[in-house]
């Protein structure tokens, strides 16, 4: 079984993001990716990861008002597992490659193939921005981060566009604001990491944000959901080999 740790914060308590790769134990097994709700813990990451390897997980494919879901129940051995969410729902789209193999309303035991743990800052220092351009109110522009990575193994550059936030800017001010973004961005971001959670996430650690970035908060780690950005690649390979080269920001008019 594969296990992998992405350590973006060294301290306690910390926020733990746990993702598992599963295979159903039935006659037509589906491969699933299930991520646990974020939780806070004081357990050293290496100890937590070892105890996560004892996970037993069952899933039930059913329906909800928001579409097909998997009802997940989990148990594991070890004192650290008291903080782990034991019962929760995830979107059935996690079963990306084997959607047709899921059997409706059947409780299925799953075999654990891989477990991934990402450590982040404590509650209150982690902000989650879903990769969606939907916003409430009359917004005129979207702030987009263009995160440049280098695949160290293949020597191939990769750019990931990520929606950060929607803002209202007067047309007469748009040129001035856009020109200021470059300097503000130099102060705003210190690092970006790819981590396995909800498929893939990008964790951006904000330093001393100004201007358009100031609402994100200094010292905050921003989570941007990427989903299954690269389905054909090993998630752990991406996490090990994609090195952040820099981040550019653009304002996109709506």
UniProtKB/Swiss-Prot annotation:
It is found in: Virion; Host cytoplasm; Host nucleus; Host cell membrane. This is Matrix protein. One of its GO terms (cellular component) is host cell plasma membrane. Transmembrane segments: none annotated. The gene is M. It holds the Pfam family Matrix_Pneumo_N. Interacts with glycoprotein G (via N-terminus), and protein N. Interacts with protein M2-1; this interaction mediates the association between proteins M and N. Coiled coil: none annotated. It is a peripheral membrane protein. GO terms for biological process: virion assembly. It comes from Avian metapneumovirus (isolate Canada goose/Minnesota/15a/2001) (AMPV). Has a crucial role in virus assembly and budding. The matrix interacts with the RNP complex and this association serves two functions: facilitate virion assembly and inhibit the viral transcriptase activity. Early in infection, M is localized to the nucleus and may inhibit host cell transcription. Later on, M can associate with lipid rafts supposely by interacting with the cytoskeleton and with the cytoplasmic tail of glycoprotein G. The binding of M to host membrane is stabilized by the surface expression of the viral glycoproteins. One of its GO terms (molecular function) is structural constituent of virion. Keywords: Host cell membrane, Host cytoplasm, Host membrane, Host nucleus, Host-virus interaction, Membrane, Viral matrix protein, Virion. Belongs to the paramyxoviruses M protein family.
